[in-house]
A protein has these predicted regions:
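A basic, amphipathic helix-loop patch mediating RNA/tRNA/ribosome contacts
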Residues: 2-36
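Fe-S ferredoxin-like electron-transfer domains
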Residues: 29-173
């Protein structure tokens, strides 16, 4: 789509220039599109194009779905944009502005404070994690360490080393 000038928003996709690695987990669902002949919306990052495929990227249904997905992600995210170091350079903040999200219609799960961990090579603040899985892709496919993965389920899901160990105790470089 971007090759022909169509902007489809995404949070989980990352194209690591200079490598053959692409992160297309379809985990964020911000990139949903309508595909003719399909009942459900499809994630653009994980949908292979075929000859004659008709894809609609900005219908009312698509835009409403993207806004709801952004609202759901924000519902489980700290409301501290003004004090966040990424303020003004944050993809999630940009999407909230794009979809004119001013109030939170959803309340995320009641979670206890999540881990914040700093090592010599990485700062890991799980309060900011939106489960895009970019870090997992870089760890597994670029660094080829395999130290990170999704553990637990539902609101308890987190991206962490096996058995929820600390990064300093893992194979992380």
């Amino acid at each position: 789509a971007c090759k022909i000038g169509i902007n489809i928003p995404t949070l989980c996709h990352i194209d690591l220039k200079g490598t053959c690695i692409k992160n297309n987990p379809a985990s964020c669902r911000i990139c949903v599109v309508e595909v003719a002949g399909r009942r459900n919306l499809a994630p653009a990052c994980a949908t292979r194009c075929t000859e004659g495929m008709v894809v609609k990227t900005s219908t009312l249904r698509v835009m409403n779905a993207r806004k709801v997905v952004a609202e759901l992600i924000l519902s489980d995210h700290p409301n501290d944009c003004l004090t966040c170091p990424k303020c003004g350079n944050c993809e999630l903040q940009t999407l909230a502005l794009r979809f004119n999200i001013r109030e939170m219609p959803f309340n995320g799960g009641e979670l206890s404070p999540r881990k914040r961990e700093v090592t010599s090579s990485i700062v890991r603040n799980m309060d900011k994690c939106i489960f895009c899985r970019r870090c997992e892709s870089v760890c597994n496919d670029v660094q080829t360490v395999g130290a990170l993965g999704a553990i637990r389920r539902g609101f308890n899901t987190t991206i962490a080393p096996a058995f929820d160990r600390m990064m300093k105790d893992s194979e992380c470089t």
